[in-house]
């Protein structure tokens, strides 16, 4: 029996129209364009600022584009998985809302929460479902409305984040392409350094939590930066060595777009030139679970069948990991 691989067959993306520039940020908090560009690498970010729109709105836009590009029949979709830290509601899942918006009748749907590592977990989960032989066509979506949890009076966090979504079609194949390997790790000791203090079952919403601004993202930036550089660099080098990849045969590195200095550190560890590294943080900021697929969306035209791609990310938990993908189609023809 031939081995079943899971291959990405298409990419769709969406970012909101509203552009929040560094100049606007500098009018909200004590900062400036030079500091933000030097310390973070973000020039502007997109914000979903229309009343009553949430993560599923962006996810639908991205997934709809994906289905059109891949000429997919809604009845053929077996599953929809959404990675998000900012769901529309605590329940039902954003994925179930997305199923309805896409008119999918035969799919099962669920969310997963791995913060900025969400897309790595999506690829691993979809690959496992495909490998079971019971599922052939799965939509995976990384989507986050980070503006919904950012305090725009906090100069340490508000310049970093933006909103966006991107979706990939993952299908079964017997060809030697697709999601080839992954290394995923969790260090639960990261809780104190990156979290939202209230809103869950430990500290439910109340007048007190709202008054004390406990529903915003909290981050100890220096600690997170140190862990991110170390773990992303190490795990990326490990998966490369494990699969016989090096600076000569790695075609693209796709790092989580959290900070340009972290991206530089990962590229340096692999000795890969920045020309081989997908970077769009300057335009979108950190969109959490959407950063990796948004990179694919931006760079799709440059991808060639057989390209070796290494994805790597680090997020709250702490979660971190790397995924090796052998690209399955010529992006210039899409």
UniProtKB/Swiss-Prot annotation:
One of its GO terms (biological process) is fatty acid biosynthetic process. The keyword Transferase applies. Pfam families: ACP_syn_III, ACP_syn_III_C. It catalyses: malonyl-[ACP] + acetyl-CoA + H(+) = 3-oxobutanoyl-[ACP] + CO2 + CoA. Homodimer. Belongs to the thiolase-like superfamily. FabH family. This is Beta-ketoacyl-[acyl-carrier-protein] synthase III. It comes from Phocaeicola vulgatus (strain ATCC 8482 / DSM 1447 / JCM 5826 / CCUG 4940 / NBRC 14291 / NCTC 11154). The gene is fabH.
